[in-house]
Amino acid sequence: MTVPFGFVVIDKPAGITSHDCVSRMRRVFGIKRVGHGGTLDPAVTGVLPIALGHATRLLPYLPGAKSYRGSIQLGQRTSSDDQQGDLISKQAWPELNTAEIEAYLEPFRGRIQQRPPQVSAVHVQGERAHARARRGETMEIPARTITIDRLQLLNWNQQLGQIDFNVHCSSGTYIRSLARDLGELIGCGACLGWLKRTQALGFHEQQAVPLPDRDNPALTTPPAVLPPLTALAHLPRLQLNEEEQESWSCGRRITAHQDQCQPAPKPLASDQQESAPNQTDPSANKSMLVVIDCRGEVAGMAYWEDNATVKPKVVFNAQG
């Protein structure tokens, strides 16, 4: 059986983990090499990109920005900053109009400092914060820099104390923290009511398909696989000739000029231009490009070592 090479965008339902989705897709496709991009909390629904086969090696090179639609509940503080946590306190929210809500949202737009929730996957002294929180420990989690490019108020319900919103943000942003911090600014506390991710790693909700049946995933017809180039449309491309392809397959540098590159078919908008999720990658800040073989398929990833040299970063079907 041919191992699939590409992506499936799952519309993750509530109540299961991102890893549960990966496990089910392994059974559907009958392969072990499956990964996902951008963990979603169990209660959160929406876009979950699934990488199949060697496409898992492409995940660090996809755009990291994400978009969400959701609701913030005023008047409630919880242990996890969403409604799945234990209720810490409850109080009435003030009378507010739409203009006042907009004014409260303004400080959260742009480049800001944000402290992750106590119940989160952030490492604190070598251990996940959520593991320590479940033991009843309280810890100081350092704030970190994130970017909220767009925070749109959709509706304010005074009677229910609910703020409906759209947000477009950088990788590493916690929407639960946004809800918590907004509540503290208003003075009544708040937590996340519900959340749906509408865009992640360059994929959007219109591309998402339902998660295959839990009871008989092996009998389910596998969903269509999006080709790798679909996910890499934000990067320029370098087409190899036969001689270059032989060198490339052996992991050797390619001599080329930047004017030989094809421009990115769908370059990122200004509010999406951030570094790839893998910030520890030494090539993360270099000019990445997709390398295309003689058949027009993805041969790997590379970056410009200098103005005339392309250095391999990921090589598919390597020889030697």
Swiss-Prot record:
Q: Which residues are catalytic?
A: D41
> Mind listing the GO biological process terms from this record?
mRNA pseudouridine synthesis; tRNA pseudouridine synthesis
What span is annotated as the signal peptide, if there is one? none
User: What EC identifiers does the entry list?
Assistant: 5.4.99.25
- Catalytic activity of the protein: uridine(55) in tRNA = pseudouridine(55) in tRNA
UniProt GO MF annotations: RNA binding; tRNA pseudouridine(55) synthase activity
The top EC class, named as a word, is isomerase
Q: Where is the composition biased (Polar residues)?
A: 270-284
Chain intervals with Basic and acidic residues compositional bias: 125-136
For region Disordered, the annotated ranges are: 116-136, 259-284
Q: Which UniProt keywords apply?
A: Isomerase, tRNA processing
User: Which Pfam families does its entry note?
Assistant: TruB_N (PF01509)
What is stated as this protein's family in its record?
Belongs to the pseudouridine synthase TruB family. Type 1 subfamily.
Q: What does this protein do?
A: Responsible for synthesis of pseudouridine from uracil-55 in the psi GC loop of transfer RNAs.
Protein name per Swiss-Prot or TrEMBL:
tRNA pseudouridine synthase B
